[in-house]
C-alpha cells in the first residue's frame, strides 16, 4: 500500500464528512484512511462510524481527548502504507493532493517529509502554511502565513512540515520515532 492517510478528530461534525470525502476523491487511490476520534461529544463520531463498511477505512475511538500527537501516533502504529499523510479534520484536499505529495517524496529517497501549501478557507488566494521555518531566535513559524499563495508554488527545503496536511516517509518515522505526546506539543 502506498499511503496511510490519518485524520485526528475532536468534535469536527461541521466539516469531517467533507474532509473525508475529499480524501476518497483522490486521483491516487492506493491508500487506507484512518480516523482517530478523540472522545467527541458532537455528531462527528456517528459520521466517522458511517464509513466503517469500507475495507480501506479504519476507525479508532478514544473515550477521551488524548491530544493531537497521541492520536496521530495511534494511527501511525496501525498504518500499513509506505508513507503516512496527516490531514486535519477541517482541511479539504484538492483531488491530486496525495498524488502530488507522493510524487515529490519519491523524487528523492532522502526526503522525509513533504508539506502541503495550505490555503485560507475564506481567502484562498492567501497561504495559511507553506511549511515551517525557524527564526534566528529559535522560534518555529508558519512559512507564508497570510501572504499570496502564488509565491509558494515551487518546491523548496523547509525546516518542518505542518502536520495539518503533510506526508512523511514511514520507514524514517520507524527509525527516529513518532510525534512527542507531551501536552505542550501541538
Question: What kind of region is each of these model predictions?
Answer:
Residues 84:
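Short aromatic/hydrophobic "clamp" motif used to bind/position activated sugar donors
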Residues 116, 135-158:
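Short, flexible, basic/aromatic active-site loop/helix in glycosyltransferases
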Residues 22, 37-46, 64:
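A conserved acidic beta->alpha catalytic loop
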Amino acid at each position: 500500500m502506498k499511503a496511510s492517510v490519518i485524520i485526528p478528530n475532536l468534535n469536527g461534525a461541521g466539516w469531517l464528512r467533507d474532509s473525508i470525502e475529499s480524501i476518497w476523491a483522490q486521483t491516487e487511490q492506493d491508500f487506507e484512511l484512518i480516523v482517530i476520534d478523540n472522545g467527541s461529544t458532537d455528531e462527528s463520531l456517528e459520521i466517522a462510524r458511517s464509513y466503517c463498511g469500507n475495507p480501506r477505512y479504519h476507525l479508532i475511538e478514544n473515550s477521551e481527548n488524548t491530544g493531537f500527537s497521541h492520536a496521530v501516533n495511534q494511527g501511525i502504529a496501525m498504518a500499513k502504507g509506505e508513507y503516512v499523510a496527516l490531514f486535519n479534520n477541517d482541511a479539504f484536499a484538492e483531488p491530486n493532493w496525495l498524488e502530488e505529495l507522493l510524487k515529490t517524496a519519491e523524487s528523492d529517497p532522502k526526503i522525509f517529509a513533504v508539506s502541503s501549501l495550505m490555503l485560507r478557507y475564506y481567502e484562498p488566494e492567501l497561504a495559511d502554511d507553506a511549511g515551517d521555518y525557524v527564526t534566528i531566535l529559535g522560534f518555529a513559524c508558519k512559512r507564508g502565513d497570510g501572504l499570496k499563495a502564488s509565491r509558494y508554488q515551487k518546491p523548496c527545503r523547509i525546516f518542518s512540515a505542518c502536520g495539518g496536511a503533510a506526508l512523511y516517509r514511514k520507514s524514517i518515522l520507524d527509525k527516529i520515532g513518532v510525534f512527542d505526546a507531551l501536552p505542550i506539543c501541538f
